[in-house]
């Protein structure tokens, strides 16, 4: 059986994701589609709209065969670390190809750029440092470095191009025998906040239109599969809310206000004295959005600051980051009958343990952080919903489609 991997967040699963999934099957001839999916917190440093289990259900309903979790230690990281963890996990399940969506749509451009990076890494890094010393953000410094190298025609202001390049770099750096492939995104840009197409919209615009309430679900219904709509309805009916940063702000405020600056300096991503600014601005900030606007600078992008805030919320330290640099297990979140057949075919040969019960992971540093992330994710619920969500983390077996 030919397995093809995709790297996803599905926040939420929408028609653009369905197009990517169907095109991946068509273009690769895959017998089995394996999705490695971020857990309850995402790469841009924000809580997922609904839990990993609800999003797994969306994925399986749409035709994904196997869903595995990208642990927090890789999911809430820079593009390079995110890609490294995801590619390693897909390789551990013997994926022959990975297929990602991009604004560019030309895989040759990604491969050429990744090769250039490996050949000229020292020069690239030197250019990045020069730009950083001028006070610009890392994404802009990185884009400027590529421009100076005259190394690529990729538009690195586009998030999916950045992630796609990171996937290909990870494959080449690790010398992993996976063939990368890309499908051009259609109709909507990743950052689009409005609807400009009758059936395709970005996840950003869908979350904005939803406004954290089921009352606006019909507004986004044309842009999502019926199974996604049903899952969102069920989640809201069960828990009474969708997850947004504002709901977590009181917990973040408590963490920052009661922590010493020395303690904040131990948190992953807290560098260059940003802890002073965090402590200074948190006191008067009435909302998460107001807090972010008060601490944002040219050097510190919104995304970078959101990741720092998420790490503070989940107490992810620099020391823990050092202990969690490569995946140590494959956590199965769900599978179809076809996915089950594939796993039966390969499970005796897997280089990492395939985990269906997290009780087997209680001493694993990567899972210890995952557990803290689950506690943080559930914190906004009243009882008994909070306890029920935490039980999901420990007791839910892989979902079957």
Swiss-Prot record:
MF (Gene Ontology): ATP binding; ligase activity, forming carbon-nitrogen bonds; tRNA binding
Catalytic activity: cytidine(34) in elongator tRNA(Met) + acetate + ATP = N(4)-acetylcytidine(34) in elongator tRNA(Met) + AMP + diphosphate
Subcellular location per the Swiss-Prot or TrEMBL entry: Cytoplasm
Pfam families given in the database record: HIGH_NTase1
Keywords: ATP-binding, Cytoplasm, Ligase, Nucleotide-binding, RNA-binding, tRNA processing, tRNA-binding
EC number(s) stated in the UniProt entry for this protein: 6.3.4.-
Leader sequence residues: none
PANTHER family, per database record: TRNA(MET) CYTIDINE ACETATE LIGASE
Known role: Catalyzes the formation of N(4)-acetylcytidine (ac(4)C) at the wobble position of elongator tRNA(Met), using acetate and ATP as substrates. First activates an acetate ion to form acetyladenylate (Ac-AMP) and then transfers the acetyl group to tRNA to form ac(4)C34.
Similarity section: Belongs to the TmcAL family.
Protein name: tRNA(Met) cytidine acetate ligase
Originating gene: tmcAL
């Amino acid at each position: 059986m030919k397995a093809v991997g995709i790297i996803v967040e599905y926040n939420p699963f929408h028609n653009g994701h369905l197009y990517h999934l169907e095109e991946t099957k068509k273009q690769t001839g895959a017998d089995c589609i394996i999705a490695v999916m971020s857990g309850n917190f995402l790469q841009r440093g924000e809580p997922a709209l609904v839990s990993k289990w609800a999003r797994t259900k969306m994925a399986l309903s749409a035709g994904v065969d196997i869903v595995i979790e990208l642990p927090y230690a890789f999911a809430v990281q820079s593009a390079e670390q995110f890609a490294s963890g995801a590619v390693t996990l897909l390789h551990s399940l013997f994926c022959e190809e990975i297929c990602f969506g991009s604004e560019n749509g030309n895989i040759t451009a990604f491969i050429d750029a990744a090769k250039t990076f490996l050949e000229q890494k020292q020069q690239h890094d030197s250019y990045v440092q020069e730009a950083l010393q001028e006070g610009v953000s890392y994404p802009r410094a990185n884009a400027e470095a590529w421009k100076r190298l005259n190394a690529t025609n990729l538009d690195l202001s586009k998030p999916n191009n950045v992630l796609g390049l990171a996937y290909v770099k990870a494959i080449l750096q690790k010398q992993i025998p996976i063939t990368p492939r890309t499908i051009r995104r259609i109709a909507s840009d990743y950052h689009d906040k409005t609807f400009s197409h009758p059936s395709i919209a970005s996840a950003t615009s869908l979350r904005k239109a939803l406004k954290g309430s089921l009352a606006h679900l019909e507004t986004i219904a044309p842009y999502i599969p019926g199974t996604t709509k049903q899952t969102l309805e069920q989640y809201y009916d069960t828990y009474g809310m969708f997850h947004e940063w504002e709901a977590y702000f009181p917990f973040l405020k408590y963490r920052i206000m009661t922590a010493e600056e020395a303690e904040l300096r131990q948190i992953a991503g807290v560098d260059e004295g940003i802890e002073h600014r965090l402590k200074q601005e948190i006191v008067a900030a009435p909302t998460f959005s107001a807090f972010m606007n008060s601490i944002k600078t040219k050097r510190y992008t919104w995304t970078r600051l959101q990741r720092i805030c998420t790490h503070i919320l989940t107490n992810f330290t620099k020391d823990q980051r050092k202990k969690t640099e490569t995946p140590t297990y494959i956590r199965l979140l769900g599978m179809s009958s076809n996915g089950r057949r594939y796993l039966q075919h390969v499970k005796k040969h897997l280089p990492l343990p395939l985990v269906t019960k997290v009780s087997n992971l209680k001493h694993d540093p990567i899972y210890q952080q995952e557990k803290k992330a689950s506690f943080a994710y559930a914190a906004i619920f009243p009882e008994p919903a909070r306890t029920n969500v935490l039980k999901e983390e420990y007791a839910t077996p892989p979902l079957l489609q």
